Curated annotation (Swiss-Prot):
Binding annotation for Mg(2+) 2: 126, 129, 287
Protein name: Fructose-1,6-bisphosphatase class 1
Assigned keywords, A-Z: Carbohydrate metabolism, Cytoplasm, Hydrolase, Magnesium, Metal-binding
Free-text comment on the cofactor: Binds 2 magnesium ions per subunit.
Annotated compartments: Cytoplasm
Binding site for Mg(2+) 1: 107, 126, 128
Organism of origin: Brucella abortus (strain 2308)
Length: 340
């Protein structure tokens, strides 16, 4: 019996045989116009989307060609690198250099990679967020931030100088969330055409949420104020918060970001008492910054517990930061506990 073959795709009731939604490429062309910095930004985003389309093809093949999770080295912070980490880094760097960017800062390289000498934008990127989930069917993603390259150290600028930011989520569909400073846009990759088509515009977070995303196994290591926040939430409608909360934790910042951008919620990964976690764990430049940019564009907030992420001036390329993001009201409430 043939289990798979060259069959036509499944068509559901209500499906259209033609995707007519605007492509991200067309949107970016219209946004950029003749502005040189905008054109450079658009070209960088297009390069990332091209890489995402190629990367998802390898992710989908799993272990068939070889082990994508094979350990092949360590990065600047001595985190173990998998084969797919290095491969995705090389892929995006190659495409971004071809797109004319000035420099690329990747989680997988100690120093920025030089690009075009007169390039107008610099790209900070985590080529494959959540690579610990490789082979498990759990979320993976690519997250990026684009800065003007008009200063000597473009990656040591505060996040409020970002021109654009976004992420690609590799799940049961390949979804893009991005902003060029004019609201958050969602798009989905059509595997037939190879194009990302826009599905939602001006995405906004709700005013209130009862969904929390954090690693509950480290609660005992949190500060007294943060433990009080968690305990009060877990008391539900019988506690001081007066309502029940749900908990979600996907183990990849892009996965949690994508869910929160669609359904609302609050994510936190803050500093705690464990060695190596004193300043938080996520990287400020290419994880916290793009998330904070998107949260702001969607009407939410992002802080390190007390300070707006977008106001923090990085001191090093791979600086770590605590991160709290999501629905603005809940970010503010957590902030009151954080400083206790």
């Amino acid at each position: 019996m043939t289990l798979v073959g060259n069959f036509s795709p499944l068509v559901l009731v209500g499906d259209s045989d033609r995707v007519e939604a605007e492509t991200v490429g067309a949107y970016l062309d219209g946004w950029a116009g003749h502005d040189k910095v905008r054109l450079a930004t658009a070209n960088a985003i297009k390069a990332i989307l091209s890489g995402a389309g190629r990367l998802v093809g390898r992710i989908a093949r799993g272990y068939l060609p070889g082990d994508p999770g094979k350990l092949v080295g360590v990065n600047s912070d001595q985190d173990q690198q998998k084969s797919i980490d290095v491969g995705s880094h090389n892929l995006f760097v190659e495409l971004l250099i071809a797109a004319g960017v000035a420099s690329i800062l990747s989680e997988e390289a100690d120093l920025p990679v030089a690009g075009k000498a007169d390039g107008l934008v610099a790209v900070a990127i985590d080529p494959l967020d959540g690579s610990g989930n490789v082979g498990l069917g759990a979320p993976l993603g690519t997250i990026f931030s684009i800065f003007p390259a008009d200063v000597e150290e473009p990656f040591l600028q505060p996040g409020n100088r970002q021109i654009a930011a976004g992420y690609v989520s590799y799940g049961n569909s390949v979804d893009l969330g991005f902003s060029v400073g004019e609201g958050v846009i969602f798009a989905t990759l059509d595997p037939v055409s190879g194009q990302f088509h826009i599905t939602r515009r001006n995405v906004k977070l709700p005013e209130r949420t009862s969904d929390l995303a954090f690693n509950a196994s480290v609660q005992r290591h949190l500060s007294a104020g943060m433990q009080a926040y968690v305990n009060d939430a877990f008391l539900g409608k019988d506690g001081p918060r007066g309502r029940n909360f749900n908990m979600r934790w996907l183990g990849a910042a892009v996965g949690d970001m994508h869910r929160i951008m669609q359904r609302g919620g609050l994510f936190f990964y803050v500093n705690d008492s464990r060695p190596g976690y004193e300043k938080g764990r996520l990287r400020l430049v290419y994880e916290a910054n793009p998330i904070a940019f998107l949260a702001r564009e969607a009407g939410g907030k992002a802080t390190d517990g007390s300070r707006p992420i977008l106001d923090i001036v990085p001191q090093t390329y791979h600086e770590r930061s605590a991160l709290v993001f999501g629905v603005a009201e809940e970010v503010d409430i957590l902030g009151e506990y954080f400083v206790k």
